[in-house]
Amino acid sequence: MEPNIIVRIADSGDTVYAETITNEMASSAQARGTGIARRSPDYVSQKIQEGKAVIAVTATGEWVGFCYIEAWQHGQFVANSGLIVAPAYRKTGIAKKIKHTIFQLSRDKYPNSKLFGLTTGLAVMKINSELGYEPVTYSELTDDEEFWAGCKSCVNYDILMSKDRKNCMCTAMLYEPKQETNKQESVGEVSSKNEAPNLFMKMDISKFLSWFRKK
């Protein structure tokens, strides 16, 4: 990432970038030929004022990138939405830095919520995987009607509805905060019951990880 770029939680002064952000979201989706749930400058400004957005700017105040938080089903599900980077700053690591920052902000604000995303971008999928997201079926996402209504402005909305919201062009990914804790508890239970099988399991996993790193 370029040293003169600042990635931080957005504040009320950043609402001046709202129209630039939404215009770039729309033009980027059009250039890729993919769909996107469109957001208005007012909506983006609201997220900024609520402290639920991360922005990247240069030291001179030039807008570089953006992402915001949405919560559904009374905070049971949280999405990091609208990730966008200005064309001149793409492939510089900015998107990854923004995603990591918005992910941590989401975990701080909603520590017990499931984080999910719908995306057609391979780069976003890769970053999500690094953060602990896993591909899931649409049935594992929120059933909040307001969330799905946001897809109406997407060019692929007819495809989504023709499949009863069970599938579309986007890949669904989910991060469950308690997943790692549950895995650790399960290993502990096996250990207390039978040390030998657990030792074999650890050795087997170790060999697998060693093989995986060589790939």
Predicted features, each with a name:
Residues 1-3, 107-112, 116-215:
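Terminal substrate-recognition subdomain of acyl/acetyltransferases
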Residues 4-20:
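A short beta-loop-alpha structural element at the N-terminal edge
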Residues 10, 83-85, 121:
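Hydrophobic adenine-recognition pocket in adenosine-nucleotide-binding enzymes
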Residues 13, 39, 119-120:
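Short beta->alpha linker loops
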Residues 17-21, 43, 101:
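Alpha-helical elements of Rossmann-like donor-binding domains used by nucleotide-donor carbohydrate transfer enzymes
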Residues 22-87:
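A conserved beta-strand-loop-helix scaffold within acyl/acetyltransferase catalytic domains
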Residues 85, 91-106, 115-117:
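Conserved acetyl-CoA-binding loop-helix of GNAT-fold acetyltransferases
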